[in-house]
Amino acid sequence: MSTALIVIDIQNDYFPNGKMELVNPDKAAANAAKVIEWFRQNNKDNIFHVQHIASDPALGFFLPDTEGSEIHETVLPLEHENMITKHFPNSFLKTDLESKLREKGITKVIVVGMMTHLCIDATVRAAVDLGYETTLIEDACATMELSYQDKVVPAEQVHYAFVSALNGMYANVISSGDFLKK
């Protein structure tokens, strides 16, 4: 069984002073970096960095050719690692991610990145729908608080609601510490 790591949208706009600052992105990125390093040290060449580039300027962040859209320094890809550019929350939608995974015979994916409630959720569900055994490293993900009408949902609750919904049916959800013990 061949395994790939998918690193989603760990980009500058999600960090302090970015245009769409998340809660605790530094902690999530540091945990993602540990998982990336594990892949690199264990001769796992199947690392896919996904970068969201806004196709509509109205989005207000991840605008083309801006510092905010660049991959954060904590998780910079190496020259030989795969780069995927996306324009939608689902990392598979209108990208070559699936074809590249199939070319390499990948059957299992490990997912880390941002935002838990959008791009992580959409990508994990799509991966399972496409037949990949999927693991989500939950503490290598970050999100933000959400609101609906007069209700505000804190980021931690948003995060755990989404990872709880994904756990079992869609993914094996584990911590970076548990992953690194393997």
Please annotate each region the language model reported.
Residues 14-18, 56-59, 144-147:
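A short acidic, helix-capping loop that chelates divalent metal ions and anchors anionic groups
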Residues 5-20:
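Generic N-terminal amphipathic, Lys/Arg-enriched alpha-helix
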Residues 7, 45-52, 137:
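Short beta-strand segments at enzyme active-site cores
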Residues 2-4, 31-42, 61-182:
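Active-site-adjacent betaalpha module
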Residues 14-15, 50-55, 73-83:
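Short, basic/glycine-rich phosphate-binding loops at helix/coil junctions
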